[in-house]
Curated annotation (Swiss-Prot):
Subcellular compartments: Nucleus
Species, as recorded: Mus musculus
UniProt-recorded name of the protein: Insulin gene enhancer protein ISL-2
Biological process terms in GO annotation: negative regulation of neuron differentiation; neuron differentiation; neuron fate commitment; positive regulation of transcription by RNA polymerase II; retinal ganglion cell axon guidance; spinal cord motor neuron cell fate specification; visceral motor neuron differentiation
Record domain LIM zinc-binding: where: 25-86, 87-149
Top-level taxon of the source organism: Eukaryota
Listed GO MF terms: DNA-binding transcription factor activity, RNA polymerase II-specific; metal ion binding; sequence-specific double-stranded DNA binding
Low complexity biased stretches: 326-336
Length: 359
């Protein structure tokens, strides 16, 4: 918290901060005496010039309008202090806001969306069992699978994980380390051991118990030993193998479902809306609109050319029509000349009368 204090400067000799006289104010930032009218004080007893109190990272001036943080003798604004020294998510390394809900695992803090298994990426919900291994979250199924692989892959490694067993050597009483040849020989004996064959009744009993609880406790295993007549080791190995097979099967089914979903949603690598092609149609039928009747004026020379193309021409009348057209007196002649000329022409439809035609 930054406070502004009205200061009356003390006109005394400047001295050390530890030996300052009553009424003097020494700036923590520059170490000189403060003669300004106002002093910026940071709780509990740190006093600054107004020009000296600023963030050590972004050089933003700090006053009573913002929050000031002091760490190792340096002042920071709230944004830089949270970025540098605030608690961050152990998964995404992003800070938290005051409204975020978090999940804690020992000393690590996670966002709710980041609290997932590092193997199968399944989100861990409240009530789920998980393990924290080298700052990585593991769900119960993946943790058990990891223990099984460690037990099968490195049986003689120092500090075995729970559930892992080493090789049983005949000369276990001797404290000497077995030679490399003996170790290879024992490995060969392990690969050629006799497999345990289960009958139908034993298999049905184990499957029924597995459907009820894939991870039976010690009491349930003792009951299975009495019911099936098998050794505890055979029952434990059968449950381990069954869980491993179901895990692989579920992963394979999930991959197949994702592949089918991606095949349906994409076409040759391009994602879009699927369309169905229809039958081909004529172009004019596809044009939408209403028919419009267009009327044009037919000039006189067109009627004259149509009259000239007729086969049964009356030569005297045609010669008179041609001479009449060439004289150019169609528009200047009297009405009687036009009437007499029309009476001499053969009776043909639309010979000289302009009529509207459809185009």
């Amino acid at each position: 918290m930054v406070d502004i204090i009205f200061h009356y400067p003390f006109l005394g000799a400047m001295g050390d901060h530890s030996k300052k006289k009553p009424g003097t104010a020494m700036c923590v930032g520059c170490g000189s005496q403060i003669h300004d009218q106002f002093i910026l004080r940071v709780s509990p007893d740190l006093e600054w010039h107004a020009a000296c109190l600023k963030c050590a990272e972004c050089s933003q001036y700090l006053d009573e309008t913002c929050t000031c943080f002091v760490r190792d003798g340096k002042t920071y604004c709230k944004r830089d202090y949270v970025r540098l020294f605030g608690i961050k998510c152990a998964q995404c390394q992003v800070g938290f806001s005051s409204s975020d809900l978090v999940m804690r695992a020992r000393d690590s803090v996670y966002h709710i969306e980041c609290f997932r298994c590092s193997v199968c990426s399944r989100q861990l919900l409240p009530g789920d069992e998980f393990s924290l291994r080298e700052h990585e979250l593991l769900c119960r199924a993946d943790h058990g699978l990891l223990l099984e692989r460690a037990a099968a892959g490195s049986p003689r490694s120092p500090g075995p994980l729970p559930g892992a067993r080493g090789l049983h050597l005949p000369d276990a009483g001797s404290g000497r380390q077995p030679s490399l040849r003996t170790h290879v020989h024992k490995q060969a004996e392990k690969t050629t051991r006799v497999r345990t064959v289960l009958n139908e009744k034993q298999l049905h009993t184990l499957r029924t118990c597995y459907a009820a609880n894939p991870r039976p406790d010690a009491l349930m295993k003792e009951q299975l030993v009495e019911m099936t007549g098998l050794s505890p080791r055979v029952i434990r190995v059968w449950f381990q193998n069954k869980r491993c097979k179901d895990k692989k099967k579920s992963i394979l089914m999930k991959q197949l479902q994702q592949q089918q979903h991606s095949d349906k949603a994409s076409l040759q690598g391009l994602t879009g809306t699927p369309l169905v092609a229809g039958s081909p149609i004529r172009h004019e039928n596809a044009v939408q609109g209403s028919a419009v009747e267009v009327q044009t004026y037919q000039p006189p020379w067109k009627a004259l050319s149509e009259f000239a193309l007729q086969s049964d021409l009356d030569q005297p009348a045609f010669q008179q029509l041609v001479s009449f057209s060439e004289s150019g007196s169609l528009g200047n002649s009297s009405g009687s000349d036009v009437t007499s000329l029309s009476s001499q022409l053969p009776d043909t439809p639309n010979s000289m009368v302009p009529s509207p035609v459809e185009t």
